[in-house]
């Protein structure tokens, strides 16, 4: 079990970034971060700023992007009311890297297993650009820790990728494309049931009501009868997204 409270202190002022796709796993990590911050004394939690980034590819399925916007609205309201050191950042691909510019303008074929050009251009680059444009925060080269919702209980391919980047004896693992960055996997040992039980729980860390309970009920409905899994926050261009589930782009 990853101890986020301990890691928060151990990692000093190194910024944390949670990549929010809107799916169940990244939602769980986002909530886990918020609960962790609330459990820390104010003078400890203020040692670093955490970022929640969400990349809108501009071809997300309408029900999905509507849900993401609702969750982000609730998240922003909560962190503002609780004065938590969290900044929510919404990102989009550069115009010249959008789906239709590449498909129609450049004549690219629709993404396929052997040529999934969309992953790097539409998911990875916007976040990389955000980090590079803010060197005063992240440094150059950037020193940052990504909190990802990858789980060993996921697909075989994802499990293999996690194993390849695992640092034995540490909860901070290597990043696929950014050598100076690290990856923290707060829910790596959770089962799918663990994830759902967590995001749909009614209780919150302070004994109150889960502020995301209602919006997560809608998330559960989105998943109903859908393919398991969602497009994760990709940090390795060789990894495939999961077109076919409700959390893939509608174009695939």
What residue spans do the PLM features occupy?
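Nucleotide-activated chemistry modules centered on ATP-dependent adenylation/adenylyltransferase
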Residues: 1-18, 24-252
């Amino acid at each position: 079990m990853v101890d986020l409270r301990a890691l928060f202190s151990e990692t000093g002022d190194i910024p944390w970034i949670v990549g929010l796709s809107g799916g169940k796993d990244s939602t769980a990590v986002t909530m886990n971060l918020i609960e962790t911050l609330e459990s820390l004394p104010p003078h400890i939690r203020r040692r670093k700023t955490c970022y929640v980034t969400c990349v809108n590819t501009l071809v997300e399925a309408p029900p999905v992007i509507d849900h993401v916007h609702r969750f982000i609205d609730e998240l922003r309201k909560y962190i503002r009311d609780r004065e938590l050191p969290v900044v929510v950042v919404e990102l989009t691909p550069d115009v010249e890297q959008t789906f239709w510019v590449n498909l129609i303008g450049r004549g690219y074929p629709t993404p396929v297993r052997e040529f999934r050009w969309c992953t790097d251009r539409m998911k990875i680059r916007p976040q990389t650009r955000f980090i590079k444009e803010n060197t005063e925060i992240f440094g150059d080269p950037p020193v940052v820790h990504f909190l990802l919702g990858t789980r060993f209980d996921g697909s075989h391919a994802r499990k293999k990728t996690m194993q390849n980047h695992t640092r034995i004896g540490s909860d901070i693992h290597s990043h696929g494309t950014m050598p100076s960055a690290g990856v923290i996997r707060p829910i790596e040992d959770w089962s799918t049931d663990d994830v759902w039980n967590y995001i749909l729980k009614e209780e919150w860390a302070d004994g109150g009501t889960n502020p995301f309970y209602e919006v997560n009920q809608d998330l559960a409905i989105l998943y109903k009868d859908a393919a398991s899994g969602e497009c994760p926050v990709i940090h390795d261009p060789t990894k495939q997204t999961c077109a076919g589930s409700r959390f893939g782009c509608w174009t695939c």
